[in-house]
Amino acid sequence: MESSGSSKVRWGQNRRLNFIDVRLQYDGRINRSDLMQFFDISAPQASADLGLYQQLAGDNLVYDTRQRIYLATPEFKPITKRSEATRYLNELQRLARGIVEPDESFVGYQPSTGVVVSPSRAIEADEVATLLRAIRDRVALRVRYQSMDAPEPQEWVLSPHALGFDGLRWHARAWCHARQVFRDFAIGRLDVLEHVFSAKPVDPLLDEGWNNEVTVSLVPHPGLTPSQRRVVMRDYGMVDGHCELRCRKAMLFYTLRHLNLESLAISDVPAQQHVVVENAEEVKQWMREDRDGLQHLRR
């Protein structure tokens, strides 16, 4: 269901089957008008889509003649990845943040939803467009950048090759021609001044921190009770008592900071730190190898 077909018709039909699956999974019901209103299709087309879904997963739904709707059966089993809980909850978050409009989302009934708010980053569309084109065309840029290590802005010639998100802000991953190093530059702190076509192109494959991945292994805090450890393992989706997070080496500190584990210390209060880093010595070595991690990204 997730892969698109060879034509627009096939892709559209797959999307409508996904819609049916999601609505049955979470709303427990669907009717023709749901499909007709969301996709702007005819009643015969909606009936055909519901009929096809019945052919694919007949045990998932039953028609209630009194209510004139299809109801999910107790034996319902989703047939598409769109019905996964994580994707559904992410969609609720996007709706709550206003990233998507209700008429663009497969979510039917939307419960009252609250999300942690973050400052709105002042990033200009023109700056992002310029960075994207520089990455695509392998062109260097002269920028004015305000580092947190310097009292005043400085000008640098950068060759950006990727974008990264640390959970709060977006960064441009770029080669700094003056310092001869790959670094992260917060997009909201830079102003593009001009293109520098004379700068020597830099191969992004040389950025070992970006191209190499590392694995952080998390385990329950040793001070938790057996019952607490079990619920933490379930909450984090642990297998055999631990879960593994793979990330780019250059994103390692961001990942740890996002989990409030950047110090790698084990708290004396397990209730405040549910998990600890199992391979802390490995992580320390990776952090030492990455200059940005060693400096704790103070820029």
UniProtKB/Swiss-Prot annotation:
Residues 120-200 form the WYL domain. It comes from the Bacteria. Residues 145-189 are annotated as: Probable ligand-binding region. It holds the Pfam family WYL. GO terms for biological process: defense response to virus. Keywords: Antiviral defense, DNA-binding, Repressor, Transcription, Transcription regulation. Residues 1-84 are annotated as: Winged HTH domain. GO terms for molecular function: DNA binding. Residues 197-299 are annotated as: WCX domain. The keyword Nucleus does not apply. The keyword Disulfide bond does not apply. PROSITE patterns: WYL. Residues 85-196 are annotated as: WYL domain. Disulfide bonds: none annotated. Induction: Represses its own transcription. Transcriptional regulator of a CBASS antivirus system. CBASS (cyclic oligonucleotide-based antiphage signaling system) provides immunity against bacteriophage. The CD-NTase protein synthesizes cyclic nucleotides in response to infection; these serve as specific second messenger signals. The signals activate a diverse range of effectors, leading to bacterial cell death and thus abortive phage infection. A type III CBASS system, part of a CapW-Cap6-Cap8-Cap7-CdnC-NucC locus. Homodimer. Has an N-terminal winged HTH domain, a central WYL domain and a C-terminal WCX domain; the WYL domain of each subunit reaches into the other subunit to form swapped domains. This is DNA-binding transcriptional repressor CapW. It comes from Stenotrophomonas maltophilia.
